[in-house]
């Protein structure tokens, strides 16, 4: 690849006697949407956690956008995640007592932005995801698809280099799932954000540019994906 944003080399990771990763090499191209697939217990979540700097591998290296994450302390990795990485989870993990605007603004406030600037950017991202009329509502008053779009806006408001999406539509019905995936991929492709998408669902993976499959701690394939 001409311009990889993530280069992982020789990753191993064990939890007690269990080898979760057994020497994985992987590159992710800048602006690519990569689907990481695999059965439960295959090591796919451990791989992605290493790529995102959430955990350190036992051996090997991860270079993200020019920074060797494996050479950093936990506090330094946390700073990189705040500034350059976005996360979307299956159940959104929004704060229920905050409005949509406040949820989206939170990462900017944590990074030291003023309340006014953070709210302005939060509202702009809600608008981009078709949620301008939900800005003052709490997550509990929204549909599941709307709440997940708020979570996507929160993940993208800092303009991360890489978005890690862990089963982002796993809790939604098929119609909502397609709507949310379509909205997410539209905005990330416009902004050039790289996406690493963890999924067990082939239809979700079909939205990606490429798929890799993790089995027993090893990569078993890398395939171009054709949207359904």
Put a short name on every predicted segment.
Residues 1-12, 220-228:
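ABC-family P-loop ATPase nucleotide-binding domain
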Residues 4-214:
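ABC family nucleotide-binding domain
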Residues 211-223:
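H-loop (His-switch) and adjacent beta-strand-loop-beta switch element
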């Amino acid at each position: 690849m001409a311009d990889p944003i993530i280069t992982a080399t020789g990753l191993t990771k064990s939890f007690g006697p269990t080898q979760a990763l057994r020497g994985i090499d992987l590159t992710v191209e800048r602006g690519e949407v990569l689907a990481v697939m695999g059965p439960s217990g295959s090591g796919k979540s451990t791989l992605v956690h290493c790529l995102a700097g959430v955990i350190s591998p036992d051996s090997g290296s991860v270079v993200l956008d020019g920074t060797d994450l494996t050479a950093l302390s936990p506090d330094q990795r946390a700073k990189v995640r705040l500034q350059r990485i976005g996360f979307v989870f299956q159940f959104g993990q929004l704060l229920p007592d905050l409005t949509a605007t406040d949820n989206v603004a939170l990462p900017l406030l944590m990074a030291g932005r003023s309340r006014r600037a953070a709210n302005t950017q939060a509202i702009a991202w809600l608008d981009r995801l078709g949620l301008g009329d939900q800005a003052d509502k709490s997550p509990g008053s929204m549909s599941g698809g709307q709440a997940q779009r708020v979570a996507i806006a929160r993940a993208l408001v800092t303009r991360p280099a890489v978005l890690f999406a862990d089963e982002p539509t796993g809790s939604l019905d098929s119609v909502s799932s397609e709507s949310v995936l379509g909205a997410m991929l539209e905005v990330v492709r416009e902004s050039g954000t790289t996406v690493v998408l963890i999924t067990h669902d082939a239809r979700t993976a079909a939205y990606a540019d490429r798929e890799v499959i993790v089995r027993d701690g090893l990569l078993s394939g890398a395939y171009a994906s054709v949207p359904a």
